[in-house]
């Protein structure tokens, strides 16, 4: 039996955890689930901890609390904060223990091995606290696998008691290891794997669809240009999108916008207003899981060439090549929080996005309406043959002007024509097969 097929053993159960803290953790869970071998028994374990959801929204939306939280994410304040927050999370683990025990009770065949995949640190700490107790009670072997969902070495992601922690980069691995050593914490295995992007979107486009993507990013073709605009779970950035769409529509009437948004009270007004905009297709649901599914469906049923998004876990869609279903040009709004800046840093280190100096130079050209010389364009694009995304300037009007300037100056067209799959995938960290690697590694632990 091959390592991955060990997971299909009837006595093995895979449990995916889910926390109500934005859509990012669920997107990663969805990606991992999509790459499982057929025949694996799975269960989704959700948390009803409203505190996690409330804290996430409060910090994401309010500027003062966001800045305070960022202060706690660096240096000595981070170390102190992590110490107390970890204790807090582990002290409220009774509900998690009860839910895992219920999973055992609900199985017809009592599992002997249970793989629990945690994509949120809060749930990971709670599970780690009760893991040995449940093993003793059930006689089963529990393997706790933690997947870090941003390339951020925040200390709270170090989970004593986990069997393995997967991180997107060597940098994050080394910083977490150093923190654990200096803090005298229980040793946990940390491994670097490519970020687990959804394998369904790594499928190659047909030659017809790839040509369509090329036409969409090219100037003067008259093609309908499809944008995907996912609204974050905490609904950050709605005002930006609300103003960006008409700004773009005023420049070209054949832009088409696919907006993915959860239906909650604080998105109602946004949805009511953008519904009246021309060429806007709304994809909404009241349920997180449906929102994640509909996002994937948009890419599967359309040739999406641009995505305007936050540099959250969505930043790692840059691991798709342009000839893949999910390989749209990524256009990032202003980063919010340390983890989003860390994700942008990951992209810069690997040449998937321009550095700040070149980015600001391009912004300046767009602001002044200057044409980009052929020599400069060729030089930039030839040197940066792994380029996948751009950071947008602050403000919806400047962002719209920049996107239009890039189209008129054939920047996007040139970027794709000079793109090299080999260059973009030259480093292990930037490959799109992270899900396959994940399950191969997990199989060896079972």
Region locations from a protein language model:
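Nucleotide-activated sugar donor-binding and catalytic core shared by glycosyltransferases
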Residues: 1-446
